[in-house]
Amino acid sequence: MLALIQRVTRASVTVDDQIVGQIGPGLLALIGVEPGDSDAQIRRLAERLLSYRVFGDDAGKMNRSLADTGGGLLLVSQFTLAADTSSGNRPGFSTAAPPLEAEPAFNRLAAICREKHRGGVETGRFGAHMVVDLVNDGPVTFLLRP
């Protein structure tokens, strides 16, 4: 499992012209599920999403986490994130978990984050064509693995 996180001033996800998830200041996390991702890996990634320090303290140093700021978390499933791009000019998707494995893993991640984070957790819609709108703050972007 991997997450491409972006510090945002706002972000939203739209499906069929309806906003299905939106946050103000916080993190947008694009989530790629890989075959065999364990519950321990899912829990560890949730912990990292909530405790990774990407927000500025009073001195402007990245010393505050999402848990510290109480900002929003927008989770968006993105199977292309787990693609194999090591050769050729076309991605391969054998390194991404199939939907029947990926959807429960993504939902588990969202449930853990909701349980642990007071700042609000929103999601896109698994398997749907989504339009993601965001304002990246910084820009600040990191790739996290459990």
Swiss-Prot record:
Motif Gly-cisPro motif, important for rejection of L-amino acids location, chain numbering: 138-139
EC top class, as a word: hydrolase
Domain of life: Bacteria
Keyword Iron-sulfur: no
Keyword Cytoplasm: yes
GO CC term, one of those recorded: cytoplasm
Catalyzed reactions: glycyl-tRNA(Ala) + H2O = tRNA(Ala) + glycine + H(+); a D-aminoacyl-tRNA + H2O = a tRNA + a D-alpha-amino acid + H(+)
EC number(s) recorded for this UniProt protein: 3.1.1.96
GO biological process: D-amino acid catabolic process
Compartment list: Cytoplasm
Example GO molecular function: D-tyrosyl-tRNA(Tyr) deacylase activity
Pfam families in UniProt: Tyr_Deacylase
Record's keyword terms, sorted: Cytoplasm, Hydrolase, RNA-binding, tRNA-binding
Subunit note: Homodimer.
Family as reported in the entry's similarity comment: Belongs to the DTD family.
Function: An aminoacyl-tRNA editing enzyme that deacylates mischarged D-aminoacyl-tRNAs. Also deacylates mischarged glycyl-tRNA(Ala), protecting cells against glycine mischarging by AlaRS. Acts via tRNA-based rather than protein-based catalysis; rejects L-amino acids rather than detecting D-amino acids in the active site. By recycling D-aminoacyl-tRNA to D-amino acids and free tRNA molecules, this enzyme counteracts the toxicity associated with the formation of D-aminoacyl-tRNA entities in vivo and helps enforce protein L-homochirality.
NCBIfam families: D-aminoacyl-tRNA deacylase
HAMAP family reported for this sequence: Deacylase_Dtd
Entry domain remark: A Gly-cisPro motif from one monomer fits into the active site of the other monomer to allow specific chiral rejection of L-amino acids.
Designated name of the protein: D-aminoacyl-tRNA deacylase
